[in-house]
Amino acid sequence: AMIKTSRLETGVISLEQKQQPVYDTLAAALGGILLNAEKKQIDVQVECPEHLDARHDRKWTSEALFNILDNAVKYTPAGGQIHVSVEGWEMYVKIDIADTGIGISEQHQGTIFKRFYREDAVHDVDGIGIGLYLAREIVTLQGGYIWVVSEVGKGSTFSVFLLRK
């Protein structure tokens, strides 16, 4: 993750945005988390139209979505749920990743996207605090944005907005 972040920031990596289905990009991201979700008996549900396109770089956007999904698995207790839903808006495609995890306090919701940030409550969970930073950088470089709504003890919903055209 560190090398990817460095390459992205220095412009070594260029994002190749093209009009393509979000379905395939999301499927690649989900492929990276399903085994760990299964180990924790987390129910992963996905609602995504097959033919909904957005202008994005498939490889890097998949990486961004994976980072958010990976956190959802890490911070959702065994037996919990992750629900992914995708819908087309006029200018954006909105991808919601909702979990029944530990949640993020309101005071920390603005800082979770900072590089190396880790909330004190999660220091026993593996990670270096760069996944959400990298996810936001990737999405922002493509003209999109990420929004989070969370409640401690109830879970979080990360909304990723990608430009349709």
Predicted regions and their residues:
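Conserved catalytic submotifs in the C-terminal HATPase_c
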Residues: 16-21, 38, 43-53
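Short beta-strand/loop element within the Bergerat-fold HATPase_c
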Residues: 79-91
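Short alpha-helical Gxxx[C/S/T] motif in the catalytic ATP-binding
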Residues: 131-135
